[in-house]
Amino acid sequence: MLADLESLVRCESYSADHAALARSAEAVGALGARLLGTAPENIVIDGVTHLRWVFGTPRVLLVGHHDTVWPTGSLEARPWSVTAGIARGPGVLDMKAGLVQMFHALASLRTLDGVCVLVNGDEEIGSPTSRDLIEEAARGSAAAFVLEASGDRDGAVKTARKGSSRYEVTVHGRAAHAGLDPEKGVNAAVEAAHQVLAIAGIGAAVAGGAGSTGVPGGTGATGVAGDSAATGGGAGTSTVTPTLLSAGSTPNTVPARARIAVDVRVPTSAAQDHIDTLLRGLTPRRPGARLEIQNIGGRPPMEPGASAELFALASRIARELGQGPLRGIAVGGVSDGNCTAAVGCPTLDGLGAVGAGAHADDEYVEVASMIPRSRLLAELVTRTLR
């Protein structure tokens, strides 16, 4: 198992490097073929390589990704290493160890009939070319297990995830010479400053959950009393954050245009819809200015109800395997589990590696946890297929 992990970590797979992704897909496909006994279907969409294995009529979907956030060449500065039971390297936690655990778990089953495995190559950038594949597979499945890393260093699984929305607010003004006749212009930069404050005000209003929105933010509960928590900087609250701001063309011109990027995170679909209404209700503050508000993408939330039954089953199995009480937590980040849950497929996320530091220089995996996590997944799949 450790040798397999090393082979994947050494094969870099930056999301933006399609050639590297093709090499990674070949490595992951070879590993899966060796352990599952059959080669995957290679699906290339807009240059991005995804892998799919289908055994019989699928009832259980396993989801992972082979791309990472690490630019090609990162391995030189952050080489593969194992010291004192800790494995390090680019993407080791997010999520190459999860892929290794998944393949070994499936290899231990008596039969793979009813299993579908989908490993995409663009999760880290929002799954733009693979989302349809994931949702199509999820619609026909009784359960989806997502091999993202555990929710904490103790191996908690992820029972809820915030949804995300990205907006671009474009401010249209009118250009003029800043020295000769500035009064003839409509300053888009000044209007944008007003809008940034208005957007921040929406964020402050919704940060308390129900607050002034009338939409409960949630508490991070999973529907399984006593075993759940929230993490990730208020995983049960909505956030609205202006993130990027640009305006103008030259230093001596009244800006005719400005742009504001807005990041939205929500625990429920109702909150997502309500914040959409609030943002689309923004109005210009300066005469002559005009606003254009666009939702440019995102993912729906994975709400607690999507995972409740699977979490209860996983908890029972963990106890039977002597792995102690299994915790479920709600987290602020998104994954492809958001998409499987959104189409009505019961989903349990965070079944991958135990460690910490995803996307960070200190990313690591606890090697000793890999076999127990693989056993937990194997039993989950077996019982779900019954």
Please annotate each region the language model reported.
Residues M1-P90, T111, T384:
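Acidic/His- and Gly-rich active-site-bordering loop/insert found
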Residues S13, W70, A149-D154, T159, ...:
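Metal-dependent amide/peptide-bond hydrolase catalytic core
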Residues R59-V119, I125, R139, D361, ...:
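Active-site metal-coordination/substrate-binding segment of hydrolases
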Residues V63-G64, L118-N120, F145-E148, T170-H172, ...:
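Short beta-strand segments
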Residues M95-K162, G208, S212-G214, G223-G233, ...:
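Acidic/histidine-rich catalytic neighborhood of metal-dependent amide-processing enzymes
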